[in-house]
């Protein structure tokens, strides 16, 4: 194993990746990650747990044929807008159509009827019902994906903590002196946020000359072969508490599944989350088995694990797993980093693992 230390530098995107408030984004580490892997010879790459898409975008920005994957439907749509899309933009007339309440349309009212006083005001819930429907009528899949991206980011930025983990609209509305949050951002109309995020997404679209794709699968079921597979699974801390992105962003998946949303909601939850499904990446007792299956699935690929120094399983456990599979491994460490809503520091760890 060859350890290396993080140093201060910046390798900018040639193209502009959009801003995001998404929890767990690797945006602050993406230049460091690319610096560590840029000398590896590879052309095809899979971002197996794509999230915001910032790593896949960095790979695309450097001419790689990238496949973005995320099991969450709303994330895969973001991947379609920013990674797979090479030349399609959302025009001013498209935007005006999306943001107009058309008198001839009988709009559904599911959000207004079911999410009153949970996440947004009555006026905002009505706006979401209208705009979501308008987006669904756009025929071009890439234009539609850009519109979805803008809607998702607008929803996130107007939420306290940028999450949908509890019923807490009152945090936005209560008249108190605040030591956190951004009330101005929360109170900015959806339309303004939407237009801003469309502009960012349009500026992010480019053709790198290679074929890029966005898919939505369980990473353990992906069959194609890739030169390099980047793996950034949901994080379980040393106390065994995992990050459940499906729970944090259930509302965005609900928007995607709008017509079937009522059948997916756990009505015993105050915030109307979606019914939970088992996820091996949130199970501290079985997550190592998940990693073992990934290593076996992509045994002929270079594997790049983005990890935390205090995660479960431990870094040593992962290294032992890789060595048992006859792989040669390098360890790279970032500086100590303090994460939002946490008092503890940890290091970002990059494990680069080569096949026999």
Task: Name each region found by the language model.
Residues 33, 45-59, 68-73, 224-245, ...:
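Conserved proline-anchored active-site loop of SAM-dependent methyltransferases
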Residues 9-10, 119-244, 260-271:
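SAM-dependent nucleic-acid methyltransferase catalytic core
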């Amino acid at each position: 194993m060859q350890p290396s230390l993080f140093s201060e530098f910046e390798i900018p995107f040639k193209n502009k990746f959009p801003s995001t408030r998404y929890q767990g984004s690797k945006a602050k580490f993406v230049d460091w990650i690319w610096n560590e892997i840029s000398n590896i010879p590879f052309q095809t790459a899979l971002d197996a747990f794509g999230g915001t898409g910032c790593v896949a975008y960095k790979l695309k920005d450097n001419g790689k044929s990238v496949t973005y994957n995320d099991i969450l439907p709303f994330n895969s749509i973001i991947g379609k807008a920013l990674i797979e899309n090479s030349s399609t933009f959302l025009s001013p007339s498209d935007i005006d159509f999306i943001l107009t309440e058309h008198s001839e349309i009988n709009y559904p009212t599911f959000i207004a009827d079911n999410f009153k006083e949970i996440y947004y005001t009555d006026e905002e819930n009505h706006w979401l019902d209208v705009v979501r429907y308008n987006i669904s009528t756009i025929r071009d899949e890439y234009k539609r994906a850009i519109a979805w991206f803008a809607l998702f980011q607008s929803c996130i930025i107007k939420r306290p903590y940028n999450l949908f983990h509890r019923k807490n609209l009152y945090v936005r509305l209560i008249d108190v002196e605040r030591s956190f949050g951004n009330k101005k951002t929360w109170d900015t109309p959806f339309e303004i946020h939407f237009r801003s995020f469309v502009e960012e997404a349009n500026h992010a679209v480019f053709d790198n000359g290679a074929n890029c794709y966005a898919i939505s699968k369980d990473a353990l079921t992906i069959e194609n072969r890739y030169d390099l597979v980047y793996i950034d699974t949901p994080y379980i801390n040393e106390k065994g508490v995992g990050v459940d992105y499906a729970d944090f962003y259930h509302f965005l998946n609900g928007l995607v599944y709008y017509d079937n949303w009522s059948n997916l909601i756990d009505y015993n939850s105050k915030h109307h989350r979606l019914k939970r499904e088992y996820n091996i990446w949130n199970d501290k007792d079985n997550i190592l088995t998940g990693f073992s299956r990934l290593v076996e699935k992509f045994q002929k690929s270079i594997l790049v694990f983005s990890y935390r120094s205090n995660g479960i399983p431990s870094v040593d456990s992962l290294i032992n797993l890789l060595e048992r599979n006859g792989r040669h491994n390098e360890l790279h460490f970032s500086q100590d980093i303090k994460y939002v809503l946490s008092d503890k520091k940890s290091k970002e760890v990059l494990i680069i693992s080569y096949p026999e």
